[in-house]
Design a protein with these regions (language model features):
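Terminal accessory/targeting
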Residues: 19, 23-27, 31-148
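Acidic, His- and aromatic-enriched active-site or binding-groove loops in soluble protein domains
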Residues: 10-19
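A generic structural signal for alpha->beta connector loops
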Residues: 9-10, 27
Length: 148
């Protein structure tokens, strides 16, 4: 019901997760980087401006609403075969109470992510970065977590 209302009345929507917009992103879940007094110094701003996306071919789950029976979710990301050095990807998530590294396994250009703990109420996030030569790539995902 909410999704249909948004699609009818808006062209784009932004999430509460960091990332770089590219052709693979959902127009109603666009990532953004906050720029404010806490996260707005010039060095960070320059870093953000120079980030590149990490496009993907397929992302599962498509529905990022986490209910009690699927917390933590299983995440699978299939990257394009042209993406270089994808196995050098580093990911961090805020499952549990702290940011840490989830378990990551690759099969060719597919990444399987297993979180260590359940996500807390409200918002769960996964941030992945990849250093490629002298540039950085970034992928961020957001989950909405059901209340207890």
């Amino acid at each position: 019901e909410q999704v249909e209302f948004i699609k009818k009345n808006f062209k784009y929507g932004f999430g509460q997760h960091s990332g770089v917009i590219d052709f693979t992103k959902n127009a109603y879940e666009l990532p953004r980087f906050p720029i404010n007094e806490k996260y707005g110094d010039l060095k960070r701003f320059e870093f953000i401006l120079n980030l590149f996306p990490i496009p993907y071919k397929k992302l599962d789950p498509v529905d990022k609403f986490i209910k009690k029976n699927n917390n933590p979710p299983s995440v699978q990301i299939e990257f394009f075969s042209e993406q270089k050095n994808i196995k050098n990807l580093n990911c961090f998530s805020n499952d549990g109470k702290d940011w840490g590294g989830p378990e990551m396994k690759f099969d060719e250009n597919k990444l399987f992510i297993k979180f260590n703990e359940k996500f807390e109420f409200r918002r769960g996030r996964l941030n992945c970065s990849l250093k490629e030569g002298n540039k950085w790539r970034w992928l961020g995902l957001q989950f909405t977590v059901e209340t207890d």
